């Protein structure tokens, strides 16, 4: 009976034996965290060595720290705390918002600006009022007048839902769908 060999579990070559400290801090290379900073990365070198009975607790020669931000405030400007307190006092929820300031009076050298009004398109069948100002009589000539006929009176056979009621702006294709052709 031939002897069978035991399959040994091979460890990959790139796997190292475990150490009590992280591998990235053992090397003498600069250890960077990947963030952009103005100072160089700190080099970690472990102090202490393993001996037969156990391991000496480790210490580090350099510890990273964040430098204090320089005071860039110019003399005479209030600090952020004073500004935030002032802002909080002016924008308290109890007080109503201040009314908007009125526009300055127009100077006598500039011509008065006319206020813009939206044009009112009236149906051609409705008669314009006699006291209409001349600025609104121009708007009475609606763009639908030249291309469409006035709204036809609904006949008995037409459906009131499909025909456009008089008084609204008629659309050319949908003035009356169900009315018979002439």
UniProtKB/Swiss-Prot annotation:
Positions with biased composition (Pro residues): 96-117
Short sequence motif Nuclear export signal: positions: 83-94
Compositionally skewed regions (Polar residues) per UniProt: 15-26, 127-150
Annotated stretches, region: Homomultimerization: 57-71, 124-132
Region (Disordered): 1-26, 89-169
A GO CC annotation given for this chain: host cell nucleolus
Record GO biological process: mRNA transport
Keywords: Host cytoplasm, Host nucleus, mRNA transport, RNA-binding, Transport
Compositional bias (Basic residues): 1-14
Subcellular location: Host nucleus, Host nucleolus; Host cytoplasm
Motif Nuclear localization signal, and RNA-binding (RxRE) boundaries: 2-19
Predominant place of localization: host cell
UniProt keyword DNA damage present: no
Domain of life of the native organism: Viruses
One MF annotation (Gene Ontology) recorded for this entry: RNA binding
Oligomeric form and interacting partners: Homomultimer.
Described purpose of this protein according to its UniProt entry: Rex escorts unspliced gag-pro-pol and singly spliced env mRNAs out of the nucleus of infected cells. These mRNAs carry a recognition sequence called Rex responsive element (RxRE or XRE) located at the 3' region of the long terminal repeat (LTR). This function is essential since most HTLV proteins are translated from unspliced or partially spliced pre-mRNAs that cannot exit the nucleus by the pathway used by fully processed cellular mRNAs.
Similarity section: Belongs to the deltaretrovirus Rex protein family.
Recorded domain comment: The RNA-binding motif binds to the RxRE, a complex secondary structure consisting of four stem loops and a long stretch of stem structure, present in incompletely spliced viral pre-mRNAs. This region also contains the NLS which mediates nuclear localization. These overlapping functions prevent Rex bound to RxRE from undesirable return to the nucleus. When Rex binds the RxRE, the NLS becomes masked while the NES remains accessible.
Protein name: Protein Rex
Originating species: Human T-cell leukemia virus 3 (strain 2026ND)
Gene of this entry: rex
């Amino acid at each position: 009976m031939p002897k069978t060999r035991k399959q040994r579990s091979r460890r990959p070559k790139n796997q190292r034996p475990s150490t009590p400290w992280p591998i990235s801090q053992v090397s003498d290379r600069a250890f960077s965290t990947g963030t952009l900073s103005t100072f160089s990365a700190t080099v970690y070198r472990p102090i202490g060595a393993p001996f037969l009975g156990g391991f000496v607790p480790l210490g580090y020669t350099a510890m990273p720290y964040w430098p204090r931000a320089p005071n860039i405030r110019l003399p005479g400007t209030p600090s952020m705390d004073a500004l935030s307190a002032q802002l909080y006092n002016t924008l308290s929820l109890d007080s109503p918002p201040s009314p908007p300031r009125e526009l300055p009076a127009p100077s006598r050298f500039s011509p008065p600006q006319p206020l813009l009004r939206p044009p009112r398109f009236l149906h051609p069948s409705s008669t314009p009022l006699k006291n209409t100002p001349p600025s609104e009589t121009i708007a009475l000539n609606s763009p639908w007048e030249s291309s469409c006929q006035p709204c036809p009176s609904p006949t008995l056979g037409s459906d009131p839902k499909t025909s456009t009621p008089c008084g609204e702006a008629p659309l050319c294709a949908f003035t009356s769908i169900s009315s018979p052709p002439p």
